[in-house]
Amino acid sequence: ELSHQTNSLPEVCGRVCPQDRLCEGSCTLNDDFGAVTIGNIEKYITDKAFEMGWKPDMSHVEWTDKKVAIIGAGPAGLAAADILVRNGVKAVVFDRYPEIGGLLTFGIPSFKLEKGIMENRRRIFSEMGVEFQMNTEVGKDVQLQQLVDDYDAVFLGVGTYKNMRAGLDNEDAPGVYDALPFLISNTYKVMDLESPTPFINMQGKKVVVLGGGDTAMDCVRTSIRQHAANVVCAYRRDEANMPGSRREVKNAREEGVKFKFNLQPIGLELNSAGHVVGVKFVKTALGEPDEAGRRRPEPVEGSEHVLEADAVIMAFGFQPHAMEWLEPFGVELDQWGRIKAPGQQEFQYQTTNSKIFAGGDAVRGSDLVVTAIDEGRKAAEGILDYLEV
């Protein structure tokens, strides 16, 4: 009960959050004795509670006649639904995928977050009164206008799904893949679901993954499990400046992934058939800090070389995808395509359309699971205030 007071998905955060650079990194015992393993504790407590039959106590809830449509069954949408139903507001969640979780289910591999975790959470949320409309894409299977008309409020928890690119020539060549389609296709295979796209198989291939975050680690470790012949992760800064979890880097190394640091991709090499056969790199040295305080990677003259590869995965992160179906409703976006929904206002995370709220990656940009959960919960509180519940 205590862990659920501030977190709608503690069993997930205990598994996927980079605790080493968050809570455990700030632990006062870290220097001398090693940090308290907060993630493992969070995971154990929640798993044990589920094993013992725990479920949220909804006996005190007085149901109102209010109902809210939630677009997106990822961490922000699920967190919003959790808070709403606990306060007697009907929550109906719409999502284009066949299972809940969004990227928790389809983007994070099963070796890091077991698929049964979200299946169990769907059962719990359903018993709490959350209704799920899966395989339902807004703008295609149901129109936003219908949701705005039929519900007292709408929450947008649609995440960020557009892959960032490096701006290299030949990025669309055969053998070059974006991280998310690769990970999603693998999940459909693992879950034995009918995939809308072909399975991307790295078996027997020389794989180079570009990027240094947790998504890159998911890609290299998935490639290993698909029996790639060789897997290399190339990152433009040094190891100390990698944004990903230290634990994930350690796991990848132990599984056979090779790391090459201070390498910046400058081109893709193709054979006569147009298929990728290598990545051209230039070595880098770290220069002056950028606006975020991280030292800039600067190219070293005369250090160009080619690394052989017949599969290249781009794992540079995600940015907001186009949402044309929002345009007629006066929902403003910022210059990066993120939904404007400030947390500090009368109704938290309300957009420029008073009936529509938003939170998570669609508002702040690609970030951690725990921040999406937090914003989903706070947006739900804003909705409750708006509905005067």
Q: What is each residue range found by the language model?
A:
Residues 1-16, 33-62, 187:
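Ferredoxin-type iron-sulfur electron-transfer modules in oxidoreductases and energy-metabolism complexes
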Residues 45-62, 123-140, 163-226, 335-347, ...:
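Glycine-rich dinucleotide-binding loop and its adjacent helix/turn
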Residues 62-71, 119-168, 267-280, 285-288, ...:
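Feature captures the FAD/FMN-dependent oxidoreductase FAD-binding
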Residues 219, 362-388:
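A conserved FAD-binding loop/helix module that cradles the flavin
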